[in-house]
């Protein structure tokens, strides 16, 4: 990470800390109390040593008093450290919670193009793993950095009070450890950043494989998947080992420096005792302070190394937060009301990639209650057209109108609530069957829910489930067949009954008998509602009012089933290829 970017990351972290200024101040005060009490103990210890070795009889009364003071200081230090750790946990976990909430909210505001371009595993890794890594480093910083810096300042003050010249030796030699730590941390940060990126790749790959494990097994792709996994795993191991290597040599290198400092202080101190400049007790206190002075440097170098990992993780989260959200609703956007189903596309152009046009000069006018079937080869723009109708993407040129309103001038919520969708890929949330059917209408009554299930021909199999409508569905509906999942998705739409419908390959995964029952249910559902139907099996769209035959983003043919067969064109060829006798 470049220096400027690292500074910006640090500045943004500070912004997240601002709401918890009081807690941070409390942590700082507790750190000062803890350090002050800790540093007072060597003074008492030195006095105790002088009390024992002084000429004449040992002053036991004073010695006992000193021991009591030491015990009290140790007890108060432990209490202050416990409170400080509790406060630090509050700060870091709250910052992590705030960051995770913001990241998840921002993810929902991102355009579909961003989500399509990134694996779900990478996004999960940024929101979960990277934020955990960041808060772990932040917690370590609060816990050890505060006390470390205060301890260094405090010990210098106490040592100056005992002997300024020996203190000068300590202060002069100490910066060498910082040079060593800085040299190593620059190299470790790059490795931690690559480790974080590779961890995200691994999460995405494992998530993809587990989500499609049946397909992997069917195509005997296990060995190839294992090779891909091994490659990612090798990369992760390489970057992890390199990061660990650089971080692991920081502490030994600095410890070596501090051992030299300690030895130098011991020699200089002994000479001072011989000259009578300081007492043996003061030397004992000074050596204790030297040890306490060097110890925070060891901890701080460890914190710096860990903080490199934390910064790398935070940078990945901020990359997500910096992505431009989808174009917000216009300030004067109005909610669609009294939607009857008038839809019009005027000279629409669209492409996912600027250089590769997909839909060009597309025109279509749909009257309320019409059933518009869209057919054509893969990649002709059928699903893209649905994405544009729902405003998952905005058109490049032209406009789409609903009830005479440009959909860019109405709220997305009112537009999308006007459509009911049965997608090619079914989606069910982890929860009960009841919760899934009522997903679009949480306030539905029991009678309404059961009626919707019956109309979708789902009531029968639901009743046979162990707990009926209260049966728990696993993530993605793993304990249901593909047909059952699709029936529940259809029941969900049956319950809300919006004024317009989008059926994208709605029955492509259902057996023939179930398809016939669903087609009958669809007839009831689509009556009086504008419906857009996409299907490869032409048997599902023969009753459509208008069939659009698309190719390369253009309408090749348009008409009813009978009219298009009579033309003996593209639709007729497609129909004959599916229904011609073998």
What residue ranges belong to the model's regions?
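Transmembrane helix-loop-helix hairpins at lipid-water interfaces of multipass membrane proteins
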Residues: 24-83, 87, 161-165, 276-280
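Short intracellular "coupling" helices and adjacent cytoplasmic loop segments at the cytosolic face
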Residues: 1-4, 93, 101-125, 129-131, ...
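An intracellular "coupling" helix at the cytosolic face of ABC transporter transmembrane type-1 domains
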Residues: 22, 112-113, 129-138, 142, ...
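Transmembrane helices of ABC transporter permease
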Residues: 19, 23-36, 73, 77, ...
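ABC-type nucleotide-binding domain
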Residues: 322, 329, 336-582
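Juxtamembrane loop-to-helix connectors within ABC transporter transmembrane domains
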Residues: 9, 17, 49, 84, ...
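Helix-loop-helix
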Residues: 59-65, 158-175, 242, 246-315, ...
């Amino acid at each position: 990470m470049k220096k400027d970017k690292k500074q910006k990351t640090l500045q943004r972290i500070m912004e997240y800390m601002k709401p918890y200024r009081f807690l941070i101040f409390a942590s700082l005060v507790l750190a000062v109390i803890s350090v002050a009490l800790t540093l007072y103990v060597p003074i008492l210890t030195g006095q105790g040593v002088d009390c024992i070795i002084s000429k004449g009889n040992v002053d036991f009364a004073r010695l006992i008093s000193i021991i009591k003071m030491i015990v009290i200081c140790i007890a108060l230090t432990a209490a202050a450290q416990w409170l400080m750790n509790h406060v630090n946990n509050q700060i870091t976990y709250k910052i992590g919670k705030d960051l995770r909430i913001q990241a998840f909210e921002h993810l929902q505001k991102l355009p579909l193009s961003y989500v399509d371009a990134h694996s779900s595993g990478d996004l999960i890794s940024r929101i979960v793993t990277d934020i955990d890594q960041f808060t772990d480093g932040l917690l370590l910083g609060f816990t050890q950095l505060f006390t470390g810096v205060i301890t260094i300042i405090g010990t210098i003050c106490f040592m100056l009070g005992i002997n300024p010249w020996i203190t000068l030796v300590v202060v002069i030699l100490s910066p060498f450890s910082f040079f060593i730590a800085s040299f190593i941390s620059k190299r470790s940060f790059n490795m931690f950043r690559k480790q974080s990126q590779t961890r995200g790749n691994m999460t995405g790959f494992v998530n993809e494989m587990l989500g499609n494990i049946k397909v992997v097994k069917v195509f005997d792709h296990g060995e190839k998947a294992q090779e891909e996994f091994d490659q990612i795993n090798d990369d992760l191991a390489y970057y992890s080992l390199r990061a660990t290597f650089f971080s692991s040599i920081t502490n030994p290198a600095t410890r070596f420096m501090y051992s030299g400092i300690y030895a130098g202080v011991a020699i200089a101190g002994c000479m001072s005792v011989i000259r009578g400049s300081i007492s043996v007790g003061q030397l004992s206190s000074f050596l204790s302070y030297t040890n306490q002075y060097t110890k925070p440097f060891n901890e701080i170098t460890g914190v710096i190394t860990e903080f490199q990992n934390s910064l790398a993780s935070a940078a990945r989260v901020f990359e997500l937060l910096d992505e431009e959200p989808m174009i917000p609703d216009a300030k004067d956007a109005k909610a669609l009301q009294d939607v009857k189903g008038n839809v019009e596309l005027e000279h629409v152009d669209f492409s996912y990639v600027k250089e590769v046009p997909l839909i060009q000069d597309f025109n279509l006018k749909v009257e309320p209650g019409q059933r518009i079937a869209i057919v054509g080869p893969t990649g002709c723009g059928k699903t893209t057209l649905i994405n544009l109708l729902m405003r998952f993407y905005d058109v490049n040129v032209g406009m789409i109108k609903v009830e005479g309103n440009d959909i860019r001038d109405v709220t997305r919520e009112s537009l999308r609530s006007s459509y009911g969708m049965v997608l090619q890929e079914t989606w069910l949330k982890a929860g009960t069957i009841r919760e899934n059917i009522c997903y679009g209408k949480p306030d539905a009554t029991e009678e309404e829910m059961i009626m919707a299930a019956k109309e979708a021909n789902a009531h029968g199999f639901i009743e046979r489930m162990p707990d009926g409508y209260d049966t728990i569905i696993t993530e993605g509906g793993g304990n249901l067949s593909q047909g059952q999942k699709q029936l529940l998705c259809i029941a969900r739409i049956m319950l809300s009954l919006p004024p317009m419908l989008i059926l994208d390959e709605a029955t492509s995964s259902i057996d023939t008998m179930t398809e016939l029952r669903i087609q009958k249910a669809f007839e009831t559902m689509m009556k009086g509602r504008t419906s857009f139907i996409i299907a490869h099996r032409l048997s599902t769209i023969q009753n459509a009012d208008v069939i659009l035959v698309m190719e390369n983003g253009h309408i090749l043919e348009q008409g009813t089933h009978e009219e298009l067969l009579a033309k003996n064109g593209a639709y007729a060829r497609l129909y004959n290829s599916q229904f011609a006798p073998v």
